[in-house]
């Protein structure tokens, strides 16, 4: 043991260094030889331990900071760091990249020994190589893969030798075979490989007994590891003991340039570097083929997924187009159906919806629903046939559908309620009966066709006839009613003309009322038009009561009869010159008061004047004779004789 080794061990004990630190100190010592590979392998294995990794790296950085005569510490630390980067944990390379400036500063390391030799050049070159390796990522990966493969082989060598009780010499990574050591060295190490088959002299060939080297490689292993079924150089392999030919070990060593660690599975291992390269290329090709197959499968899946997405997208685009194309035939079909509907003739194409000669099948311009067809006014007038049919059960339009007759006073329709005010006070149908006949018989109603009813085949001709007979019916009705006391509305000439036509589809009041027709006085529902002299307030509501007192329509032109006091005080009777002289009213009053006999006669005379009053008034109203003269000629007053 050298002095430096003793001093190092003393420092380890005093400073209480750990096992990892002790190994790093030994690998980076100041001895004139380099660090052993076995020691560096142990340190590399310790880098996978977190605690040991920190201890190893701290000691390595401490060694890199030395200078001067301790240049070997720096150089060996760089060598150890290079080995740890390639075979140790990946954290070593990561930490070296983080502290790469500490390695770059070593490119300027200077030291010249006593002999004038520049020893710092070794440190400078090693630091440059290490910095270049750390900066080149691809090169670092390749170097690391190669170093890990070599380390695995070294581990297999140690395992194979340990199974055959073969140990390495202290301080050397080479096996203690006879190629480099004497037989005494095997005894110190624990025996020779051939100790299990007899003496080494009998098991080895003469060439081996002389200590000739088996090969040039340091990794040469015994043949028993490669061929376990054949005893290594035993007598069984040489039954006759003929050693003239070289043994199998010598022949194998002569042909093999790079022997491998052997076992039962070593039969498949390559024997040469060419076979190794061939197997490596074959493995790479197989791996590439598997990767390409996986890539093809993945691309096929992606392609099928893309095709499915495109198909789904096309389907979603086609569906709205089909809907749009499908809606066009429906619209054209509806248009064809509308065109195929029968038209109502030339009258249906008129632009004016309010024309008097409306078509038979005219539609409602307001879009309202059509009412039941073939319905008529249940209260027809005695003038003409209705020009349009009206629904009696529809919306009550008595206040709004009071149209004005053609060629007449616009306020004539509102004058009729005043002429029959007495009858409307007790008749609930008065408002309808006084307005509808005039509106229907002698005028065109603006909204008569809005109820949706359908006319008969002769309605167009009826409109033409009613327009001609409107003036005659309006002018003839007052003259007929004034000439007769009780005219029959159903025996008038216009009604006879209208009844001569086929009206099987029309309804009559009797058919509308049915068996209850006898309960309704139809004469009271038809009234005579009011004389034009009378007028009403045009702003009065149609349903409001009349302002004038109820008047008997049959006694409109009859004045009130004169009483006895009026007859006595009237100067007309006394001053009449048409019928001769006679006593005055005063003489008649005196005679009636003084004589008792003439009182019954006067009473009879007075009673006879009362019933004659209406006839005389009627005669006055029709002929125009003054009432005073009519009374003088129509009575036999004894006082006037």
Curated annotation (Swiss-Prot):
- One GO BP annotation of this record: negative regulation of vascular endothelial growth factor receptor signaling pathway
Q: Matching SUPFAM superfamilies, A to Z?
A: ENTH/VHS domain
Domain UIM positions? 275-294, 300-319
Q: Give the region (6 X 3 AA repeats of [DE]-P-W) as residue ranges.
A: 352-639
Question: Subcellular localization, per the record?
Answer: Cytoplasm; Cytoplasmic vesicle, Clathrin-coated vesicle
- Residues bearing Omega-N-methylarginine are 170
- Map out region (3 X 3 AA repeats of N-P-F) in residue numbers: 537-639
Q: How is it modified after translation?
A: Ubiquitinated.
Region Disordered: what ranges? 163-214, 255-275, 340-425, 470-512
- Pfam families on file: ENTH (PF01417)
Q: One GO term of the cellular component aspect?
A: intracellular membrane-bounded organelle
- SMART domains (alphabetical): ENTH, UIM
Nucleus: present as a keyword of the record? no
Where is there biased composition of kind Low complexity? 408-421
**Organism domain of life:** Eukaryota
What's a single GO MF annotation on this record? cadherin binding
- Residues bearing Phosphoserine are 173, 192, 195, 486, 570
On tissue specificity, the annotation reads: Highest expression is found in brain. Detected at lower levels in lung and liver.
ENTH domain sequence ranges: 12-144
What role is this protein assigned? Answer: Plays a role in the formation of clathrin-coated invaginations and endocytosis.
Subunit structure as annotated in this protein's UniProt entry:
Binds EPS15. Interacts with ITSN1. Binds AP-2 and clathrin. Interacts with UBQLN2.
Q: What is known of its domains?
A: The NPF repeat domain is involved in EPS15 binding.
Protein name as annotated = Epsin-2
Please spell out the taxonomic lineage of the organism that makes this protein: Eukaryota, Metazoa, Chordata, Craniata, Vertebrata
The gene is EPN2
